[in-house]
Amino acid sequence: MDLSVQVGSVALRGPVMTASGTAGHGDELAGYFDLSSIGAVVVKSLGADPWAGNPSPRVHQTPAGMLNSVGLQGRGVEYWRTEELPALLASGATVVASIWGRAVEDYARAAELLADLPEQVVAVEVNLSCPNLHHGSDLFAHDPQAVTEVLGVAAACGKPMWAKLSPNTERLVEVAGAAQAAGAEAVTLINTVMGMAIDVETRTPRLGAGRGGLSGPAIHPVAVRCVYDVHAAHPELPIVGVGGVAAPEHAVELMLAGASAVQVGTATFADPRNVARISSGMESWCRRQGVRRVSELTGGAHG
């Protein structure tokens, strides 16, 4: 049984990774399973500078997932490189870094600070679902030109780039094409779906920032549709599928829609071991189905 997959130029030992923002900055999950047993650990998005994030409350559970407005809190790239990355490397994990910014210049600085990373860091996921403060706070991921500009400067990281895109736009297919043209080796689909919850007793928003990103099983059909549409339009563009993966079958579904690999996010809050369980569950599913190479699943629903 061959579980290896290829995402652009990046070879992974397996198709299942953690999703950024759900597995910490370092080896936080190492006490629950062998981090070297999964495809990669994708760390929480890193800014060029420390960032406090949004006011509390930051998380609200929903009937089929959760809303969050953490606001990309973190101590920045330099702290991560010196204080958190070493333990992650010592665990034997394959690592994917992640960067974010509020302006093109922020991405440029973060990418430059990530230059010359060890070879165990195989890629940099560029989180484009952030407000562009110079353009009315529209998300970078909603504008093909903004995506082009960010990826142009993010290339300074010296690693293969994966562009993480937002589902909250009708231009997703166009934006994905722009990301590929700008140098992204893959796109990660999808980031959270914008949502909101209100406490009917206090008549106030459940989250300190008001709105937040919805994740978990509720958004899985949205993720499948987005992956399917982008693969249909850009069959040569590798896709990392993410969104509501809580069981092996969900991961298989995203691969059949067109993903080359998948990420598990919100399910790790329910049980940090779910990433490893989904990975081993995919292997069992493939054996039952007579699938010899998991990579054969990619795009299988397109006929």
Where are these regions (language model features)?
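Alpha/beta catalytic cores of nucleotide-metabolism and tRNA/nucleoside-modifying enzymes
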Residues: 38, 214-238, 246-303
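Glycine-rich beta-to-alpha transition loops that act as phosphate-gripper elements at the mouths
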Residues: 23, 98-101, 165-171, 220, ...
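Conserved, mostly hydrophobic/aromatic
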Residues: 18, 41, 80, 97, ...
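Glycine/Thr-rich beta-alpha phosphate-binding loop at enzyme active sites
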Residues: 66, 130-145, 175-237
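Catalytic cores of alpha/beta
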Residues: 27-32, 105-117, 169-182, 231-236, ...
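Glycine-rich phosphate-binding active-site loops on the catalytic face of alpha/beta enzymes
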Residues: 43-48, 123, 128-130, 186-196, ...
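N-terminal capping/small domains of soluble enzymes
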Residues: 1-95, 100-101
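Short beta-strand/loop segments at the ligand-binding rim of alpha/beta enzyme cores
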Residues: 11-17, 91-96, 156-167, 232-242
